[in-house]
Amino acid sequence: MSTQTHPAPLRTAIVGTGNIGTDLLLKVEASPLLTCVLFAGRRAESPGIELARGRGVATSTGGIDAVVDAADDIDLVFDATSARDAVRHWAVIKPLGLPFIDLTPANQGKFCVPALNLEDCLDEQYLSMVTCGGQAAVPMARCITQIAGHVDYLEIVSASASASVGPASRANLDEYVHTTEQATAEFCSTARTKTVLIINPADPGIVMRNSIAVSTTERIDIDALRDSVTAMEKEIHSYVPGYRIVVPPVATGDCYLLTVEVEGLGDYFPRSAGNLDIITCAAVAAAEARSGLRR
């Protein structure tokens, strides 16, 4: 009788113990391919630190310095802090050669949207996960631009529940817009893009919604477009279970519009917080691919 052995999970460190970092921790711990060996922040009273300790995960208030000290026991670093901090953290991690998956909108290197370019990202040390709105909307925008061939203008409007948008995310709004627009231009080959972020204070919180609109003088085969976005929905749903199209592509004159919704798994925040899930699930997918086991 042969005994099949399974490689040990990839040992990860998470820097940032806020909303995104804590949701990421729960998803990493749920993955058979990953484990969190260090959850590092700066505030001892952080609810994320308390949750991690309760789950038996090693924690530190030493931030990136704690990661450097434990580097020999870490295979990959996730950054869930802020754009400004991520720039400094990458400067420290880069010489160590550790893979670095950045969930902030710092945008210091290769964009990674798993549904679009995961295979191209496997050998990159640094990966930018763009933004939550970018992960949700850019793949659908690309479907439109690929079929149209040329668009004159592309706009993405993302709406998220206020309670799920933490202090670091609020401090990064300019970077969020800039990075989402850069990723849209890169993946969709369009020069005129606009990103709008709406933080909705409604209680109970709204489910994350993303609307994509394009203006083009090209005639688009609407049936072909619907087939394309349905295939893309299925691809994204494979790693973000709550992702779905709620308004299929419609045409009004030279404008084409569709809307997607992202419902979270409810791991840390209520299920309405799909803006957390879309980027943490994408980051986990990228890390799992790095383990060599997803392939």
UniProtKB/Swiss-Prot annotation:
The active site is at residue 132. Its EC number is 1.2.1.10. It comes from Salinispora arenicola (strain CNS-205). One of its GO terms (molecular function) is NAD binding. It is an enzyme of class 1 (oxidoreductase). This is Acetaldehyde dehydrogenase 2. It holds the Pfam family AcetDehyd-dimer. Belongs to the acetaldehyde dehydrogenase family.
